[in-house]
Amino acid sequence: MKRFYYSAVIFTGFFLGTNNLIQAQQVVGVAEAIRMTLERNVQIKQAELSKDLAAQDLFQSKSNLLPDLSASVDQNFRYGFAFDLTSAQIVNNAWTRTTAGSVGSRVNLFQGFQQVNQIKANKLQLESSATQVDKVKNDLVLNVLVNYLEAITNHELMVASEDQIALSKQQFSLDSIQFSVGNKTLADIAKSKNQVATNELNKVNLKNSYEMSLLTLKQLMEMPPETSISLERPSLESVLLNAEDKNAIDVYQKALIRQPDILKSALDKEVALKQIDIAKGGYYPTLNLSVSYGTNYSSATTRQTDPLDITTVYRVPFSRQISDNKSFFTGLSLAVPIFSKNQNKVNVAKAKIGLKQAEANEQLAKNNLNKAVNQAVLDVNAAKQKYTSATVAFESAETAYKATKERYDIGMANSLELFTAQTERNKAEFDLIQAKYNVIFRSKIIDYYLGNPIQFDNN
């Protein structure tokens, strides 16, 4: 009775543990994989930090229009022969303590519009940094799509290889029975055994490819490698139903206004234009307004107690001197550049070169997008045609294999013919699986360039 009780406890614990493991496996669709990647990936955080830096640059350029404000206090002690400026008298062989304080402000009134243009340039740079964030996200979405479909393809190929192993093992078992009664030769057994080994090797390779693509996908999602996940399989039927032939020109025109690469290159060109305006501002005069207020104190300052008696004096107290010695200053300063050792000339020339570089980068981005879109349209049309051909090829190979097996079972075909037919059938099945997911992938690439959400209808 105790043995039965312990066995029941162990079995129940094993069942619950297995059930929890199954429940713990996370089912991930492509939309969920993209969402987790965009929420967690460090590359996006880095791009957002660069955007934050650009925002601080804009804030600083706006703040540069404001006047500065500073205050200073000086405390000095002096001994010996000197002329004291505060008391306006000569001090000899005595300690003198002086205190001075001031508050000042300075504001730039005109600087060739450099500050205003810098604000405009920094606004554009902030927009460019924002599009860089979108570009990083776009690239990650494409990487997720590639690795997701690669993992799905490898998994389905692995499942197909398991079916092929079961089929070849079944054939090996039948051949072994036929060999034992003298109906098959040793060569037939060797061929059959070789087919089992070949299929098992295919499974090992496909399993490794599946695990590698799944690991890459987890890394994009910033997910621990030990996390158990399964991927939702997309439906090919919905893709084929909506997969109308695309016009490359239409796709390109829509992609021009949606792809972050193009938007960023256009903004970078606008920044380069503003940099020319900033550089040209160096040729203009600079006008500044300064304002200051100050006061001071000296321990050597004295006053006569009696106006008629110059020998009777008293030391003027600190508060009285601070009040009496107040001073106010305001002034304008104008600096006119006459010759700056060609610095302004070089700055303008470099800014113009920067504009040419930005224009070249924009054109290059458009050219690359045009090539990619045209290639994507050709690829999706070719993928649909290849899937149709692969379907016909698999059906033909399946029929040929069944016919060869029937002939082999009655002794009308040898083991080499059966081995060849099975190999061709297996290859056709693999080609069909790859063609199927290639159609899905190529169709979603078009959605990617059009800026459409990447999502699948699941089987």
Predicted regions and their residues:
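Bacterial Sec-pathway N-terminal export signals of envelope proteins
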Residues: 22-70, 74, 80, 225, ...
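Short flexible linkers and secondary-structure junctions
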Residues: 25-147, 287, 342-345, 355
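Sec/SRP-type N-terminal targeting helices
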Residues: 45-49, 62-63, 95, 109-137, ...
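A short glycine-centered flexible hinge/capping loop motif at secondary-structure junctions
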Residues: 179-183, 408-412, 449
